[in-house]
C-alpha cells in the first residue's frame, strides 16, 4: 500500500505556502508516475506564475507525458482510496516524530517587552525634598563629562 495524494491537493499546499509572500523554492520528490509528475509540475508552475491553465494540453514535445487522455486534470473518482485510517495515522505519527529531530532555525523572538520591565531607579518628581538622598542613589546620578547640554538644546532629547 502506498500513500496517494492527487496533484490538486499538492497544488493546494503550494498555493497555501505562496500566500505568505516569502521567497519560495519548489523542488520535486520521488515515487510518482511520470504522467502525474508532468501534470503536477504544470499545475504548480501555473499557480506559482498566477496563471490559470486550460485543461486541454496543446501539441508540444512533451505531450506523451500527458497520456492517456492528454488533458491536464485527471478525471476524479476512478482512483480507489486504499489508505486506511490507521495507515494515515501511522504516517502522521512518523512525520511528527521526524519533525521532532529537525533543528530549528535560530532567530530573535519578536515579543513586546512588558511595561513593568522599565522601572526607573530614580524619579526626581517623586523625590521628597525633606529626605536626604543616600550615597548609592547619588552615585547612580553621575553626569558624564561628555554631556554638553541638559535642556532645550539637547539634540538627543525626544
Curated annotation (Swiss-Prot):
Signal peptide: none annotated. It is found in: Nucleus. GO terms for biological process: chromatin organization. Keywords: Chromatin regulator, Hydrolase, Nucleus, Repressor, Transcription, Transcription regulation. Residues 120-158 are annotated as: Disordered. One of its GO terms (molecular function) is histone deacetylase activity, hydrolytic mechanism. SUPFAM superfamilies: Arginase/deacetylase. Its main location: nucleus. Coiled coil: none annotated. Responsible for the deacetylation of lysine residues on the N-terminal part of the core histones (H2A, H2B, H3 and H4). Histone deacetylation gives a tag for epigenetic repression and plays an important role in transcriptional regulation, cell cycle progression and developmental events. Histone deacetylases act via the formation of large multiprotein complexes. Belongs to the histone deacetylase family. This is Histone deacetylase 17. It comes from Arabidopsis thaliana (Mouse-ear cress).
